[in-house]
Amino acid sequence: MSKEELVKKLTEVGINGEWINPDKYGFSRTFQFELNGQIIKIEWFCNYSTLMIGNAHFWFDRISTYSGYPMQGEWIEFSFGNEKPLHLKVKESDKE
């Protein structure tokens, strides 16, 4: 997944952030955003990336903006290979 594809997927569900800690050439691998008051970072590489929430780190190589997670609200799903996905709630349901 390219850096542009990563940002596009996050933007589709209303997640806006910024590339932080650029090197001396202006290149950054770390995308940071805030979700529900918590700072979340993604360390990007084209073959897989790492989602970092505090001390918890999750590898992923796919992002789905259509999550089948059975809880109310809008969710984004991060998955790696055939492993179980990680679901992040990005928006409360209108019914909640």
Map each language-model feature to its residues.
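Short acidic DE-rich linear segments
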Residues: 92-96
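Acidic, low-complexity, intrinsically disordered interaction modules
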Residues: 20-85
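Negatively charged, low-complexity tracts enriched in Asp/Glu with abundant Ser/Thr
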Residues: 1-30
